[in-house]
Amino acid sequence: LIVEPLVLGAGGMLMYPASVLAELKKITEASGSLLIADEVMTGWGRTGTMFACEQASISPDILCTSKGLTGGTIPLAVTLVTDAIFRAHYSEDRKKTFFHSSSYTANPIACAAALANVEIWRDEPVAGRITALSVMQAVGLQRFRDNPYF
C-alpha cells in the first residue's frame, strides 16, 4: 500500500488524521503486505514532525523522501527500507544486487547539501522551532475559525 502520510498532495492537499495512517499500518501488517510512505512532500518537518509517519507512531516498510532532504536547495531522493527488506535484496552477486538508483541520487553536491541539512536537524532545535511556529499560526488563525468564507 502506497500512501502520502497525513496529506494527500496529489489529491488536492486533502488532510486525514494520524489514526487513519496507524490503521493502514495495522491492515498491511495483518495482510502481510508492505506499507510504503511517500514522504517526498510531507517529510522534513512539513507536518510538524521530521516525518509525518511519526505522528501516527508507525514505521513504514519503505519510506521515500526528497525535496526537504537538501533543504530544498538541489534535487536529491532517498528510499529507506527496513533491515529485513534490505537483507532480502542485498548480495555481492550482481544478479541479486539491491538496485537502488534514480536520476536524483549520488550527486556529490546534492549529497553535501543533504548532509548539511541533516547536521542542522541534529545540532539545532529545528523541531522546537517548528512547534513554536505551529502554535503561533494556530493562534493567528483562530480569528478566522467562525468565518464561513475562510
Please give the residue ranges for each predicted region.
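Conserved N-terminal phosphate-binding loop of PLP-dependent enzymes in the Aspartate aminotransferase
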Residues: 2-150
